[in-house]
A protein has these predicted regions:
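Terminal presequence/propeptide segments associated with secretion/organelle targeting
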Residues: 1-545
Length: 545
């Protein structure tokens, strides 16, 4: 059976190609089928099925039957799988809310598996979505490309990416076969994902013929795109494209379709990154972007943007220390501060970018409407010195102490080139303190945060207040911390510590799902310094009656 299809081969003009339906693959998924067809005409004999063709409409006798959605990698013939239009237009089945991934940056583990159909030694797979990135360093793209490819996205460095530009005069109505670019980030760095429009019904737009991320209900702007050139490849050819004028917002990203609405504005998050050199002359580079507020995609975009900004303005190999000062803007509430220092001989930008993206992921994946991320502001200062001190020793002024008395704890830190620094803290043993061993641990910020991180993973915050408290209490490592504790257990229920419970209540909770940990008696923040403190040591002092 003969059929025709529509797609863009050059510029913004929709061209036609021919096809021959070979048959129908039934039950390739739950109530899903795939129409198998051989494509021909235009450049397809040379290029085969291209990335960016996803969603190209196919007609039989003038009737829309489906959209190009599948291809055979490394195939010598342009054979495609066509998604039936009925599956694209059907209401999406109810979806369970996406849960946070164990690794918030592992897109592939967090998303539904992409559909593959085994056919002997070949595979019919969903056409990968080309992800155009502009304004990013080559190193940033190479570092994050494996994660993106695992999620079915093909990162491509280009000039167009997610930038949009207004057309000359009034733009024409959007037509089936035209190319669109889903705008994930715009500005000094930009990201756009390309596909083709299958069907337009009033203000509703249906495209791709398969999922983009499988996000379900979503909010992502999209623009018209133009094709600059076609690049044939033995693996999968693709269209080199440019984003043009804004058109509307993608509102649904389901297994069989990416659907949106024309003239609908999508909410975007403003992101500002400023990178300064600590040594004179103090040069500063600033980056301003807007990005989507997706709970899984945004942390990766933030990580890529921070890494690229650091790599573009500073060397990433060799010793460096990076100081972070910033804040996460929250809709209708006080900003959440970001403050820390990072030092390493290699890979400091990777440490910083991951550290920034982690609280962004926690905020976006919490699901609390009163803590919706509204923007991100980051100031990064880079030094070519390793300003790091290692804990060398801890001692106390007394071996034994009585209730009502004080004990001094001193810590010695050593660094490169003979750097030496001491920090002292005084703990007052309260009247009525029970006898027995009392432990004093001098530690760095990340080590002190471990117990909170464990609690966060075991019992995620049950309220916006708990999440805000968790994020604001994270300790920076520009100072050491003195933690005073006993070995008797304390209890945690729904993320809250319950110290000093009556024996009957404690016994009941010990038999429930409550979490147990050592009893933290006090924590003292020791004096800060423009250094990164690292290391942890514990000493014991005996409390006598």
């Amino acid at each position: 059976m003969s059929c025709t299809g529509k797609t863009v081969f050059r510029g913004a003009e929709v061209g036609e190609f021919r096809c021959e339906i070979l048959g129908v693959l039934e039950n390739t998924g739950p109530k899903q089928s795939v129409i198998l067809a051989r494509l021909s005409g235009g450049p397809l004999e040379e290029t085969g099925v291209m990335q960016g063709m996803s969603g190209s409409p196919v007609y039989v006798g003038g009737r829309l039957v489906g959209a190009v959605a599948y291809s055979f990698p490394f195939s010598k013939a342009p054979i495609a799988g066509i998604r039936p239009i009925e599956e694209m237009l059907a209401p999406a089945p109810p979806r369970q809310a996406r849960s946070a991934a164990t690794d918030p940056f592992d897109l592939a583990a967090s998303l539904p598996a992409r559909q593959e159909i085994e056919m002997g030694t070949s595979r019919l797979v969903e056409i990968s979505t080309p992800l155009w990135l502009s304004g990013f360093t080559r190193g940033a793209i190479e570092r994050f490309a494996p994660r993106l490819r695992a999620a079915g996205l093909e990162p491509v460095q280009g000039a167009g990416g997610g930038r949009t530009r207004p057309p000359a005069g009034s733009p024409p109505p959007l037509q089936p076969g035209e190319m669109i670019s889903v705008q994930l980030m715009t500005g000094d760095m930009s990201v756009g994902a390309d596909g083709t429009v299958t069907h337009v019904d009033g203000r509703r737009v249906y495209a791709f013929g398969h999922r983009f991320l499988g996000a379900g209900e979503t909010e992502m702007p999209f623009a018209r795109a133009e094709v600059l050139a076609l690049l044939p490849s033995l693996n999968t050819s693709f269209k080199i494209s440019n984003a043009r004028e804004w058109l509307g917002s993608i509102t649904a990203d389901n297994a069989t379709v990416v659907a949106g609405e024309l003239n609908r504005k999508a909410r975007m998050l403003p992101v500002r990154i400023r990178v300064a050199n600590a040594a004179p002359p103090r040069q500063t580079s600033s980056y301003s972007m807007e990005m989507v507020g997706d709970r899984l995609l945004t942390p990766i975009l933030v990580q890529m943007a921070v890494f690229s900004a650091l790599e573009a303005t500073q060397r990433i190999a060799g010793i460096s220390t990076i100081t972070l000062r910033g804040k996460m803007l929250v809709r209708g509430g006080e900003p959440l501060p970001l403050s820390n220092m990072y030092a390493a001989e290699l890979g400091t930008p990777n440490l910083v970018s991951a550290a920034v993206a982690a609280p962004v992921a926690a905020l976006l994946q919490s699901g609390f409407d009163s803590l919706r991320l509204a923007g991100l502001e980051l100031d990064l200062e880079v030094s070519n010195q390793k300003r790091q001190l290692q804990l060398d020793g801890v001692w106390s002024s007394k071996r034994t102490v009585r209730p009502g008395e004080s004990v001094d704890i001193t810590a010695l830190f050593l660094g490169e080139s003979g750097a030496e620094l001491t920090r002292k803290a005084t703990y007052h043993v309260p009247v009525g303190a029970p006898p027995g061993p009392l432990y004093f641990t001098v530690t760095d910020g990340p080590s002190a945060n471990l117990s909170e991180f464990r609690q966060f993973l075991l019992t995620p915050p049950r309220s916006p207040e708990q999440l805000r408290a968790f994020l604001t209490k994270l300790r920076p490592n520009d100072r050491p911390y003195l933690r005073v504790w006993r070995s008797s257990p304390t209890l945690q229920v729904q993320g809250e510590n319950l110290p000093l419970l009556p024996p009957s209540a404690g016994a009941a909770l010990l038999q429930s799902a409550a979490q147990q940990s050592n009893s933290l008696v006090a924590e003292i923040r020791m004096d800060p310094a423009p250094w990164l403190f690292s290391g942890s040591r514990t000493i014991q002092v005996e409390v006598k009656e």
